[in-house]
Amino acid sequence: MTETADIVVIGAGASGLGFANWYRELHPGATVLVLEADAEPGGYCKTIVQDGFVWDYSGHFFHFKEPEIEAYLRARMPGQEIKTVTKRSLIRYAGVDIDFPFQKNIHQLPREEFLECLVDLYFRPSSKVEGAPASFAEMLYQRLGVSITEKFLRPYNEKLYAIELEKLDPDAMGRFFPKADVADIIANMRPKQPGAGDGAYNATFTYPAGGAIQYIRALLRDLPPGTVAYNEPVVQIDLGAREVVTPKRRIGFGKVVSSAPLPMLARMTGVAHDASVFTSNQVLVFNLGFDRKGYKNVHWMYFPDRSVSFYRVGWYDNIFDTDRMSLYVELGAPHGAMFDVDALRARVLGDLIREGIVDDHQLVSHHHVVLDPAYVHVTQASLVETQRVRDGLALAGVHSVGRYGGWTYCSIEDNLIETRALARSI
């Protein structure tokens, strides 16, 4: 006999668990079943505790816009030390550390390069003459000029996305791209007040001492036992029979809410789609623990230099001021690239030494993980196909949510806001 559930949720990450909570609050008598392919919850919000270090799969910090959501999570994390931090981010440019974002801090560059950026900013191409930008690269040149684009924004983002910026949509990063016009850039040349943020979406962040998994545990707290089935991947969704198929069983459903990557969901449902438009990068993350403290008063550092293996380094130890340097180091690569992890770890350590982040430190613990997909490539073609596929699936009672279900660039809080709205509407 086929089992049934009012709602089948695919994925026990922030999006799936968030939806399960919102929906059960509105419909206490509903049967909600969450299917998770992995042995543990969290998706990419997993935490590794090793040799006294606490690492996430990568730096998953919450940047709350809605006090209601922050309060909801905090109420379900009793006893957990949670710190709200004013972010300090630096860019390592030609051996000089300047504040993030680059475009608002060009006055910190050596004089000749500052003047170069300023002149190119003033004489940047105009959209009134050249028309609206057709790509992310064109948007950068039109908005910020040649020098700012080519000194930082182009090399950094191409290291991250592992793709030419001409292929990305002009609004590929949405609100996450630090906006700055000429007036902003000039105004930022005034001395900053102590403790002032950088004006970015994540100028402050919130982080629990136990790592990002604490947010997942908060979302699990109110769900009844048996709500989440682990080690149970979905292999097919039979839209005609309205059944979800796993290696263990068939489950009849009223509706499906999926946080799986959209092209995977399209394959599971047999819905026609253009797989070629759904491209992404992958990110190799090294979590590195050292025997003693290193840099202080920095949380992120960005590296546009293409000769440096990584594009970003983050310091966990500077959030809670612990006494041993604890880093996450991120390397971008095209989807499908193969990693020689040992060789890359050695290269990363060499680059950290050359950049002065590591000197005579001893590496005492390490971990790595590959995120694939990591950053999706938002293109004009992917936007159209994403909308078409999601709309078609929704008509069949299958709703695709989250960063990868929406094939977009968004925050964890955005996923909770999105799934709360969906729970209220279906």
Question: Where in this protein do the model-derived segments appear?
Answer:
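Dinucleotide-binding Rossmann-like beta1-alpha1 core, especially the glycine-rich loop
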Residues: 51-128, 175
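Glycine-rich, N-terminal phosphate-binding loop of Rossmann-like dinucleotide-binding domains
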Residues: 12, 66, 260-262
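Active-site/ligand-binding neighborhood in enzyme catalytic cores
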Residues: 96, 113-239
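Glycine-rich FAD pyrophosphate-binding loop
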Residues: 24-49
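Conserved Rossmann-like nucleotide-cofactor binding loop
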Residues: 15, 40, 263
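Mid-domain catalytic core of redox enzymes
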Residues: 26, 232-356, 383-392
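Conserved flavin/dinucleotide-binding core of flavoenzymes
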Residues: 44-47, 101-102, 313-426
